[in-house]
Swiss-Prot record:
The record marks E343 as: Important for beta-aspartyl-AMP intermediate formation. Its EC number is 6.3.5.4. CDD domains: Asn_synthase_B_C (cd01991), AsnB (cd00712). The active site is at C2 (for gatase activity). The gene is AS2. It comes from Lotus japonicus (Lotus corniculatus var. japonicus). This is Asparagine synthetase [glutamine-hydrolyzing] 2. Pfam families: Asn_synthase, GATase_7. The lineage of its organism: Eukaryota, Viridiplantae, Streptophyta, Embryophyta, Tracheophyta. Gene3D superfamilies: Glutamine Phosphoribosylpyrophosphate, subunit 1, domain 1 (3.60.20.10), HUPs (3.40.50.620). GO terms for molecular function: asparagine synthase (glutamine-hydrolyzing) activity; ATP binding. The keyword Zinc does not apply. Residues 2-185 form the Glutamine amidotransferase type-2 domain. L-glutamine binds at R50, L51, A52, I53, V54, N75, G76, E77, D98.
Amino acid sequence: MCGILAVLGCSDDSQAKRVRVLELSRRLKHRGPDWSGLHQHGDNFLAHQRLAIVDPASGDQPLFNEDQSIIVTVNGEIFNHEELRKQLPNHKFRTGCDCDVIAHLYEEHGENFVDMLDGIFSFVLLDTRDNSFLVARDAIGVTSLYIGYGLDGSVWIASELKGLNDDCEHFELFPPGHLYSSKEKEFRRWYNPPWFSEAIPSAPYDPLALRQAFEKAIIKRLMTDVPFGVLLSGGLDSSLVASVTARYLADTKAAKQWGSKLHSFCVGLEGAPDLKAAREVADYIGTVHHEFQYTIQDGIDAIEDVIYHVETYDVTTIRAGTPMFLMSRKIKSLGVKMVLSGEGSDEIFAGYLYFHKAPNKEELHQETCSKIKALHKYDCLRANKSTYAWGLEARVPFLDKKFIDVAMGIDPENKMIKRDEGRIEKWVLRKAFDDEENPYLPKHILYRQKEQFSDGVGYGWIDGLKDHAAKHVTDKMMLNASNIYPFNTPNTKEAYYYRMIFERFFPQNSARLSVPGGASIACSTEKAIEWDAAWSNNLDPSGRAALGVHDSAYDDQLNKSVSKGVEPEKIIPKMEVSPLGVAILS
């Protein structure tokens, strides 16, 4: 994928404007260090910074149809491009790039082709025949995209805020699953799956169908002409991604080019839970494993860069984005340009620990729907921008459209957590891959308790961030926080510290409005806090704040509960010992 910037209808076709567009496009160069392109048609400019993954030799952008009347700049991967090419027998393609089909599909189907694309994408298409344009973003918002408006009536599109924040009067997130047509001058939702209405589904749980849908999502994402690997934290989601990838890699084109030995990557503080678990999974599935350790000071030193690149002041995004940012730099230094990652599973399968308190299947399902709809503001944004800061692409198979349809069609009663039956969080996913004859993972990894990435890299990480923020934000500053930051007022010193840095880079009102807010417990929505009255006094996005659920909850909070006579519950899933002998590293 890449970085895109478009300025449309700016009433200025001067050389000075072209130079300015080039200057702004270079702010996105980290997203695409392999090639730069700019096409101007009158007062319309389409710029592109390319990260070459498919057809690196000839897939430079912008892309065109045969007579160059249709111009496209794309940040994306179209996994079904070969199938789509077969549906366009009368068209001649200039490149082997997967995104080359977009201009030709538009010629055949007009604006109604977007749902035909199976992939992740953000694109701007300019039709020079009538000077109209079309902008679209993928279903869930895996790719990042913003839209802005100039005082001269121009429309601006950019992969990141920094491409347009200084030149637009107003800008905002481009909504995922939507397209914007200059002909209609409005947004239109193109992605309308059954689950989007939040009606309660009733399909029976079919573990084999779920497993097969996920395997297909993985296999299609092995489309690459460059070296790649998997992010492996040792948690359920990344471990399943790694296991399935390792199992099917040998039969792919990628294996013929780069070898059938999968590379895996993990990051953490010394002694972190994730490092140990990831090492064990890597040994079990046979990957070439790369382990990166960082110190709390390394992470603190990177905070400003992380906030600049990820473009948020959301606490949990920065906590998790920092180690991912550091790891991505190491991965890119090894010559790897694409990784598979495990984002999205917790939202789909009610995996966050606060779901233990869901009162019924209706509220659980509605919460999962809300979480998926908001992914583009949180985990998708983090995974996209913290990797692209170093020219590394992250693909997320759990957010495959067809897989989501299967997973979100399951009667949510099956996702309810029932400890007395051994059903812990994400039970339906764990059960689907609990294969006694041909195991995907060691049993205790398959049933490892949910650990948020910012916790799993080492419990000292969050504590270190809080201590550092306390040195820079005084009690007096906190008393005045609502006057300084009336929107999304920071309620902790850590949040205040991140907000100060963000405002320095992005001082515009539109920028601060682009970041989500609201109270949260262990990454919940504000609505879910009502599930447990005690949570309102313990608002922290860490999974360790899920008192009575997390096995390593904050010690001081546990002590308070015990002093009140409340015994924290431990989750002990019912499971059988794996028939395979697995060495547990100490």
